[in-house]
Amino acid sequence: MSNQDTRVVVGMSGGVDSSVTAYLLKEQGYDVIGIFMKNWDDTDENGVCTATEDYNDVIAVCNQIGIPYYAVNFEQEYWDKVFTYFLDEYKKGRTPNPDVMCNKEIKFKAFLDHAMKLGADYVATGHYAQVRRDADGNVEMLRGVDNNKDQTYFLNQLTHEQLSKVMFPLGGMEKSEVRRIAAEQDLATAKKKDSTGICFIGERNFKEFLSNYLPAQSGDMRTLNGKKMGTHSGLMYYTIGQRHGLGIGGDGDPWFVVGKNLEDNVLYVEQGFHHDALYSDYLIASDVSLVNDIDLTDGLECTAKFRYRQKDTKVTVTRIDENQIRVDFDQPVRAITPGQAVVLYDGDVCLGGATIDDVYKEAGQLTYIV
């Protein structure tokens, strides 16, 4: 099939990455349509969320490069699949990753389904990742060339079927090159800053935002030996390994969050970056999603990331059952956080990932969440 007979629907956010994605595909002769996804109702947020402004930028870019554009509303799907998950995880004392869930449920599910109804052969986004295909229809996901921007961590839940319909035109490029192309073409978004933070929070204070949806309950801040060190303002506001915002004075090493007790509403803290309570030897994770089937019965040696932009750690992965894996680390790892993603790699190939449930030392489960 020639490029001009291949319809690619581009998810456009109003940012520079998706703008250049659409431009490159148009230049390559594809039949390109731009779609702006409205995932969050910004009418009651005092204008902080910039959906209207972003859509105007999408319109400007699409008019510049000469492609049709539409806006589609996924607010209900987003609320049901991403935001309620986000709140439920915080209620459990965990630290969720809404970007992973947004990619899984919205950008590569609701949006993909919508694009197929428009006759799309592929969808494309401005993510920094790569898709490798062969003649037999096999698909692999690879890290983006720009190490600093690689987004495979957030795409770890994509299935083989989803990836077979996806293009990532920026995956082989550095961010600086993307900016250069945008400037050369004088795209409306060329000088726009990269967005930061979770889409539905924007630049607002996270603590303030969360308290609108979940009631906070203050409680004791204690060492693992039970010594009271202060008062916390609500367990959901703290994450494992957190240093700032504890309000513990005095001399010596800084203090860090090492655990939570939901039943007694206690936040555990200990002193020192390398405190033993922050280190673990293995984890159990669920919601396992692998791009391609891998036999994990005898253990797979590969590498893993436990948070975005972290260096890879050598691990051995064993399947417990259909939905759970055990990941053993070659060396103890610091501040692994339940609710976050563990993402598996074989060299530059992203194998898939899972959601961290429990973290252990060889001697037994840590006190991260009791």
Curated annotation (Swiss-Prot):
Residues 97-99 are annotated as: Interaction with target base in tRNA. Gene3D superfamilies: Adenine nucleotide alpha hydrolases-like domains, HUPs, Translation factors. Residues 149-151, 307-308 are annotated as: Interaction with tRNA. Its EC number is 2.8.1.13. It is found in: Cytoplasm. Pfam families: tRNA_Me_trans, tRNA_Me_trans_C, tRNA_Me_trans_M. InterPro entries: MnmA-like, MnmA-like_C, MnmA-like_central, MnmA-like_central_sf, Rossmann-like_a/b/a_fold. Its main location: cytoplasm. Keywords: ATP-binding, Cytoplasm, Disulfide bond, Nucleotide-binding, RNA-binding, Transferase, tRNA processing, tRNA-binding. GO terms for biological process: tRNA wobble position uridine thiolation. One of its GO terms (cellular component) is cytoplasm. The active site is at C102, C199. GO terms for molecular function: ATP binding; tRNA binding; tRNA-uridine 2-sulfurtransferase activity. It is an enzyme of class 2 (transferase). It catalyses: S-sulfanyl-L-cysteinyl-[protein] + uridine(34) in tRNA + AH2 + ATP = 2-thiouridine(34) in tRNA + L-cysteinyl-[protein] + A + AMP + diphosphate + H(+). Disulfide bonds join C102-C199. The record marks H127, Q340 as: Interaction with tRNA. The keyword tRNA-binding applies. ATP binds at G11, M12, S13, G14, G15, V16, D17, S18, M37, G126. Catalyzes the 2-thiolation of uridine at the wobble position (U34) of tRNA, leading to the formation of s(2)U34. Belongs to the MnmA/TRMU family. NCBIfam families: PRK00143.1 (NF001138), trmU (TIGR00420). This is tRNA-specific 2-thiouridylase MnmA.
